[in-house]
Design a protein with these regions (language model features):
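Active-site glycine-rich loops that stabilize anionic/oxyanionic intermediates
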Residues: 33, 40-44
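Conserved alpha/beta-hydrolase
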Residues: 52-74
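Hydrolase active-site cap/lid region
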Residues: 118-163, 183
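N-terminal cap/lid segment of alpha/beta-hydrolase-fold proteins
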Residues: 1-30
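Conserved alpha/beta-hydrolase "acid-adjacent" motif
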Residues: 194-200
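Catalytic nucleophile-loop/oxyanion-hole region of alpha/beta-hydrolase
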Residues: 43, 70-101
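Catalytic histidine-centered segment of alpha/beta-hydrolase-like enzymes
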Residues: 219-230
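Short beta-strand/loop motif that positions the catalytic acidic residue
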Residues: 180-181, 187-189
């Protein structure tokens, strides 16, 4: 197989009949590369593409995409559809020649951490999961009506009331703890996060024996003041996890 060149391709793929839009950051290398799928939050203003750039610089491919009903992707937005869209993204990644199919990770931010945990925990092809300011226990957060209306205004086919009702109906990843058995999980939390503060994670971290929690004392929910730190923390952890897996397989 020839050498892979670094680049960025526009991407479309289908999930439940909806055409989803995204981009594929391609890393250079002589062999298929480890690959991450990056899942944005709600409504997805922060795309966390600095993590994608750093991953590519370190020899990783990275797919980012927009869930149905937001940022140009077709369909009506629904929280229940996040997991289906994530599965479709994973299937797209696994068809790419430049992807090492034994080294796939999911990185979810805020609400995007929910499908990362749900899908990553159930799919043995996913070898590691990262949650940044992650949604772990939906029913432990009371979605403010004003916030729901603001977010719904940026999405297609959903109202603020719909968002709040769908939020309460989301399953908890902690209810399927056994499925996560061999998959290392990193949760990155911010002490100044007004949405999911570190106390929000306490019970879940205690239940998940294979989870590592890293806290930043200075940042908010979006890590606005600590982007370089966040990108390095996530990529260093992924590099260590996959390096350890490679050592065990030799």
């Amino acid at each position: 197989m020839g050498k892979f060149e670094a680049g960025l391709d526009g991407v479309t793929f289908t999930s439940n009949g909806c055409r989803l839009l995204g981009g594929f950051y391609k890393a250079a290398g002589a062999a298929p590369r480890p690959t991450a799928v990056l899942l944005h939050g709600l409504p997805g203003i922060e795309k966390h593409l600095d993590i994608a750039y750093r991953l590519r610089d370190l020899g990783w491919n990275c797919l980012y995409f927009h869930f149905r009903g937001c940022w140009g992707s077709e369909g009506r937005f629904s929280l229940a559809g996040l997991a289906d869209d994530t599965r479709a993204a994973v299937e797209w990644v696994l068809k790419q020649q430049s992807v090492d199919k034994g080294r796939i990770a999911l990185i979810g931010a805020s609400t995007g951490s929910h499908p990362a945990l749900i899908c990553g925990g159930a799919d043995p092809r996913i070898r590691a999961i990262v949650g940044v300011s992650p949604l772990i226990e939906p029913r432990a957060f009371q979605f403010p009506g004003e916030m729901a209306e603001e977010f719904a205004g940026m999405l297609n086919g959903i109202t603020g009331q719909d968002l709040r009702e769908q939020w309460q109906a989301l399953p908890s990843p902690a209810d399927s703890l056994g499925a996560f058995a061999p998959r290392p999980i990193l949760l990155v939390a911010a002490d100044k996060d007004a949405i999911f503060p570190p106390s929000y994670y306490a019970d879940s971290v205690a239940k998940l024996a294979n989870v590592q929690l890293i806290r930043n004392e200075e940042s908010d929910h979006g890590f606005s003041a600590c982007r370089s730190w966040l990108a390095q923390t996530v990529t260093d952890w992924l590099a260590a996890v996959f390096s350890e897996e490679s050592s065990k397989s030799q």
